[in-house]
Amino acid sequence: MPSVPSEAPASPSPKRVRTRHFQAAKEEGSRFTGLTSYDTLTAQIFDEAGIDFLLVGDSAANTVLGYDTTLPMTVDELIPLTRAVARAAKRAFVVADLPFGSYETGPQEALRTAVRFMKETGAHAVKLEGGERSAEQIRRIVDAGVPVMGHIGFTPQSEHGLGGHLVQGRGQGAEQVVDDAHAVEEAGAFAVVLEMVPADVAQRVTQELRIPTIGVGAGPHVDGQLLVWTDWAGFTTGRVPRFAKQYADLKDVLTEAARMYRDEVGSGVFPGPEHSF
């Protein structure tokens, strides 16, 4: 996203990423990046690294709170995390996830939830799952002046209905992904996440839509990429998603540091004279 500098210029603060910058990036053919973040520490690091947007995802249910799925996550649990990220992000665009059960019953419930996130957290947009089935909710939120990021393909909040973590859009299912993408765009979303969608289907959607597409396991032919940060940083236990390249192994680094601390305390090496008053 060349139109928004990733490093702070001589002025006191860097220029904030806005929805128009994602649209400009699509039109210019420059790809942008997003990461999940759930706290001030990682938000500051990713912001300073030049990541364009930070998603405070309901994936915090797994990565922060220890739930097996995202379904138990509540609005009350997610709001403090979103607030922490928004405080730290000086440049990055902050998106708040709407958790399961906070928007499905209709447009008015969706608007109430979105307004609460915007008023209480400092987020710049909200994200919700679903294509055609969520179009009215998206439209109602957008009409109230709140930017919405859509999310189609594999939608984790619907994993039981989808039969598990399965790629969406294969074979005849491709047309449903395309229809969902157009429904999200027509409802007024400024961008749409395509999760676990075949690369050729994601490419078709990207070519057909005017708004930017964001891939999560959707191949290279999209406008931006999004990853859960614990996946690429080596913190995920068990099977790491195929689409998540591991850029670091921070779990081993922290484990070794904790062991060194334990051993030095046990042996009397720490604290030494230099750590004492």
Swiss-Prot record:
Binding site for Mg(2+): 58, 97, 129
InterPro entries reported for this sequence: Pantoate_hydroxy_MeTrfase, Pyrv/PenolPyrv_kinase-like_dom, Pyrv_kinase-like_dom_sf
Cofactor requirements of the protein: Mg(2+)
Cofactor-binding details, from the entry: Binds 1 Mg(2+) ion per subunit.
Top enzyme category: transferase
Gene Ontology MF annotations: 3-methyl-2-oxobutanoate hydroxymethyltransferase activity; magnesium ion binding
Active site: 195
Keywords: Cytoplasm, Magnesium, Metal-binding, Pantothenate biosynthesis, Transferase
CDD domains: KPHMT-like
Chief site of localization: cytoplasm
Catalysed conversion reaction: 3-methyl-2-oxobutanoate + (6R)-5,10-methylene-5,6,7,8-tetrahydrofolate + H2O = 2-dehydropantoate + (6S)-5,6,7,8-tetrahydrofolate
E.C. number(s) listed in UniProt: 2.1.2.11
Record localization: Cytoplasm
Binding site for 3-methyl-2-oxobutanoate: 58-59, 97, 127
Domain of life: Bacteria
Pathway annotation: Cofactor biosynthesis; (R)-pantothenate biosynthesis; (R)-pantoate from 3-methyl-2-oxobutanoate: step 1/2
Similarity comment: Belongs to the PanB family.
Primary role: Catalyzes the reversible reaction in which hydroxymethyl group from 5,10-methylenetetrahydrofolate is transferred onto alpha-ketoisovalerate to form ketopantoate.
Name of the protein: 3-methyl-2-oxobutanoate hydroxymethyltransferase
Gene name in the database record: panB
